[in-house]
Amino acid sequence: MEAQLSAIEELVAEEINGIALAPYNDSRIRDKINLLSEQGIPVVTLNTDIENTRRIAYVGSHYTKSGSTAAGLLRLMTHGEVHVGIITGSSNILCHTERIAGFTESLKPFSDTIHIAEIVEVHDDEFESYEKTTVLLKRHPEINALYFVAGGVYGGCRSVKALGLQNQMRIVAYDMVPTTKELLRQGIISAVICQQPKLQGSKPLALLFTYLTTGELPDREQHYVAVDIRIRENCD
């Protein structure tokens, strides 16, 4: 978080005209965005949003909906008693908490058969994910499904393989990075939810360009990308 504040300060010192930012969900970042607005520097948030700021737009996933989608996928691919381990990045990242909220809310009507065993934070770190997933699965041997909310997918799946649990585990993750794609091909991961990363990268710049050249605000604040579900058969 300190690194993000420092990066913003460096950009302001270079007299930039606008910022596209994936914000850390912290009051200091919130205050900084509002200060930038007062200084006439527009901000577009991408990939994850932050509440109660004067950013001109957000481009990214509808995270509660993507969490609900993950819950729906899990229901379709499991039967009987299901015990889910949730592996997230950080409770200080809004998109991570919103995904979990959408996921758990959608599973409430099925709480007699689908249970949340535990939620662990791995801070998008593969080594931390490997270690904490190993501890999680040993502490809860009943877990037969994993929901990866953010990064750390490769490390967590390496743990599943090391424990020999790949054939009894259903795994849902996000974003088709090369390692995740390979795990999907191998059948370790059951489904991946993708979020149009190229659009998330290009749209904020287009919105900033239009605002800076014409003075026109975006026609809406939220620009949600489509939810794209991939399984082994359509991962290429």
Q: What are the roles of these predicted feature ranges?
A:
Residues 3, 66-70, 94-113, 128, ...:
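Short, solvent-exposed amphipathic alpha-helices that sit
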Residues 8, 17-35, 103, 121-179:
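Hydrophobic alpha-helical
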Residues 28-65, 177-185:
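Flexible loop/hinge segments that line or gate small-molecule binding clefts
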Residues 56-57, 83-91:
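Short beta-strand segments enriched in small/hydrophobic residues
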Residues 59-84, 129-130, 180, 196-213:
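Hydrophobic alpha-helical segments within soluble ligand-binding/sensing domains
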Residues 91, 107, 196-236:
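Hinge/cleft segment of the Venus flytrap/periplasmic-binding protein
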